[in-house]
């Protein structure tokens, strides 16, 4: 469950290290986001010579949450930290590598490029 002002790790090599959620996309009354949802983020911490700078505003897709994600078979999966991947306006990742596992639910949300770059899909 990602709310506005939630801090997330960045799971790609776009240059950002930490981002903060500004807005949850998908309706004016929508308050929370889960895995596979698109949010608007502000870069709070970035590395030098990266593709993005501190203060930049981008869209991101959530790939890991500490809140459990329930599946149809009754199982649940959760992670230690919240993480997101920065995407451009065409819904493609800005970075060329993905760090850490991502969840299978991204496949249904049409983020196949992120799944193909990820080292592990849970």
Swiss-Prot record:
It holds the Pfam family Ribosomal_L14. SUPFAM superfamilies: Ribosomal protein L14. One of its GO terms (biological process) is translation. GO terms for molecular function: large ribosomal subunit rRNA binding; structural constituent of ribosome. PROSITE patterns: RIBOSOMAL_L14 (PS00049). Gene3D superfamilies: Ribosomal protein L14. It comes from the Bacteria. One of its GO terms (cellular component) is cytosolic large ribosomal subunit. Keywords: Ribonucleoprotein, Ribosomal protein, RNA-binding, rRNA-binding. The keyword Thylakoid does not apply. NCBIfam families: rplN_bact. Part of the 50S ribosomal subunit. Forms a cluster with proteins L3 and L19. In the 70S ribosome, L14 and L19 interact and together make contacts with the 16S rRNA in bridges B5 and B8. Binds to 23S rRNA. Forms part of two intersubunit bridges in the 70S ribosome. Belongs to the universal ribosomal protein uL14 family. This is Large ribosomal subunit protein uL14. The gene is rplN.
